[in-house]
């Protein structure tokens, strides 16, 4: 199984308001190969962008891989590492407080992708000295800047 390292970051300008612009940045690494992806969207949230980055990155892999996935998103990392996703599925896509899970469609896509790959989710501190997390942040901001033009 190929070993792949993935860094993702999502961002949203005007999060929680109308007419937002959001984006994500992804760095995929396999051996000596490195691929960078950036994409921007209208009317989104930071959490949708964080989750979309992970879904997009895993979707790009053409065969099952062993993956270390680094993100500064507590939303994404906790949903996996603290078994929120498993509990949501068991509870018919309801949270512990019985409200509907937000971004259910994206979580369902991620759940399907996780059946294909072996993924270790690792939390990194955002806006610190992590080279690849910082690169993903820069890619997301570039995508938003270019989208605004």
Curated annotation (Swiss-Prot):
Its main location: cytoplasm. InterPro entries: RNase_H (IPR050092), RNaseH-like_sf (IPR012337), RNaseH_domain (IPR002156), RNaseH_sf (IPR036397), RNaseHI (IPR022892). Its EC number is 3.1.26.4. It comes from the Bacteria. Residues 1-145 form the RNase H type-1 domain. GO terms for molecular function: magnesium ion binding; nucleic acid binding; RNA-DNA hybrid ribonuclease activity. It is an enzyme of class 3 (hydrolase). GO terms for biological process: DNA replication, removal of RNA primer. Binds 1 Mg(2+) ion per subunit. May bind a second metal ion at a regulatory site, or after substrate binding. Keywords: Cytoplasm, Endonuclease, Hydrolase, Magnesium, Metal-binding, Nuclease. It is found in: Cytoplasm. One of its GO terms (cellular component) is cytoplasm. Endonuclease that specifically degrades the RNA of RNA-DNA hybrids. Belongs to the RNase H family. This is Ribonuclease H.
């Amino acid at each position: 199984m190929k070993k792949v390292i993935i860094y993702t970051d999502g961002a949203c300008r005007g999060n929680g308001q109308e007419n937002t612009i959001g984006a994500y940045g992804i760095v995929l690494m396999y051996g000596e190969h490195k691929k960078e992806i950036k994409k921007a969207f209208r009317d989104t949230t930071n959490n949708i962008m964080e989750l979309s980055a992970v879904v997009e990155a895993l979707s790009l892999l053409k065969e099952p891989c062993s993956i270390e996935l680094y993100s500064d998103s507590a939303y994404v990392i906790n949903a996996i590492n603290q078994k929120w996703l498993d509990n949501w599925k068991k509870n018919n896509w309801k949270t512990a407080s019985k409200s509907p899970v937000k971004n259910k469609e994206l979580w369902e896509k991620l759940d399907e992708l996780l059946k294909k790959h072996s993924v270790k989710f690792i939390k990194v501190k955002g806006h610190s000295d992590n080279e690849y997390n910082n690169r993903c942040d820069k890619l997301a901001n570039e995508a938003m800047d270019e989208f605004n033009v």
